[in-house]
Amino acid sequence: MANPKNTESLAELKNRFADIDSVFVTEYRGLTVAQITELRRALGSDVQYSVAKNTLIKLAAKEAGIEGLDDILTGPTAVAFIKGEAVDAAKAMKKFASENKAFVIKGGYMDGNALSAAQVDAIAELDNRETTLAKLAGAMKGNLAKAAGLFNAPASQVARLGAALQEKKEA
């Protein structure tokens, strides 16, 4: 007979896997409760950071259609369930890992693909969505100004040529 606590935990994990955009898997061995609380605060409201049994995580992930996590689900494991922007969560986790050597990012899952620890680290190096859109808008604005200058240039050149011809004719 299944343990009721495990059954409840499995149902909760299934719900979390069904309602997320990406997942990062970490090892929390050696961290204090205060440090884990600090990490949860740094991750923000779009991320649920949970400690769970590897077996339950594997079962819930499999039922949610998420594959490729089995290799990294060893040892004491905590999972960051991310709804929305994964870049901000990756940045927060990378910063936390640099300040707390006991914290290890094992990998994750995003857009139908399993991620290695190096890939999660690479995600942390990306700009978030707002920054990328701001850069794109700035680049477009600059290019539009250049284009307007190019379109106006022939007209002004014709006007200068006309003025020069008129001066030459008068002389």
Swiss-Prot record:
GO molecular function, a single term: large ribosomal subunit rRNA binding
Pfam families given in the database record: Ribosomal_L10 (PF00466)
Extent of the signal sequence: none
One record GO biological process: translation
CDD domains: Ribosomal_L10
Sorted UniProt keywords: Ribonucleoprotein, Ribosomal protein, RNA-binding, rRNA-binding
Gene Ontology terms: cellular component: large ribosomal subunit
NCBIfam families: PRK00099.1-1 (NF000955)
Similarity comment: family membership: Belongs to the universal ribosomal protein uL10 family.
The protein's role, per its UniProt record: Forms part of the ribosomal stalk, playing a central role in the interaction of the ribosome with GTP-bound translation factors.
Subunit structure: Part of the ribosomal stalk of the 50S ribosomal subunit. The N-terminus interacts with L11 and the large rRNA to form the base of the stalk. The C-terminus forms an elongated spine to which L12 dimers bind in a sequential fashion forming a multimeric L10(L12)X complex.
Annotated HAMAP family: Ribosomal_uL10 (MF_00362)
Name of protein: Large ribosomal subunit protein uL10
Biological source species: Corynebacterium diphtheriae (strain ATCC 700971 / NCTC 13129 / Biotype gravis)
